[in-house]
């Protein structure tokens, strides 16, 4: 089973909404979800601080910012 990485940070309303969208996609596609707090890693913080939330699978950014179900589903369906 593939692992999908979700980069976010605490106290981020957009990240919370994005996680709900990602959980809906997870109901339709089987994947492991790893949630990573970018504030715990300087390199991740520098890379993603202006993009969060970010969905990544196999090293490819599927979508970032304001996540929507169709884009995330289609992007992950191609990878999984």
Task: Kindly label every feature range from the protein language model.
Residues 21-36:
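Conserved helix-turn-beta segment immediately C-terminal to the redox Cys motif
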């Amino acid at each position: 089973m593939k692992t999908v990485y979700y980069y976010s940070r605490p106290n981020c309303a957009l990240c919370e909404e994005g996680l709900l969208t990602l959980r809906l996609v997870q109901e339709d596609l089987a994947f492991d979800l790893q949630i990573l707090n970018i504030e715990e890693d300087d390199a991740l913080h520098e890379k993603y601080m202006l993009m969060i939330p970010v969905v990544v699978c196999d090293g490819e950014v599927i979508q970032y910012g304001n996540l929507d179900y169709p884009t995330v589903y289609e992007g992950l369906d191609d990878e999984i």
